[in-house]
């Protein structure tokens, strides 16, 4: 699992 997915940056 990535710590900063695009969904969160989003």
Swiss-Prot record:
Q: Which GO terms describe its biological process?
A: defense response to bacterium; killing of cells of another organism
Where can this protein be found? Secreted
Coiled-coil intervals in this record?
A: none
Question: How is this protein annotated for GO cellular component?
Answer: extracellular region
Record keywords: Secreted included? yes
Keywords attached to this entry: Antibiotic, Antimicrobial, Bacteriocin, Secreted
Keyword Ligase present in the record's keywords: the answer is no
Role according to the record: Has antibacterial activity against the Gram-positive bacteria L.monocytogenes, L.lactis subsp lactis and L.curvatus H28, but not against the Gram-positive bacteria L.curvatus CWBI-B28, L.brevis and L.plantarum or the Gram-negative bacteria E.coli and Pseudomonas sp 55. Has no antifungal activity against S.cerevisiae, Penicillium sp BKS-TAN2 or A.niger.
- Specify the protein name: Bioactive peptide 2
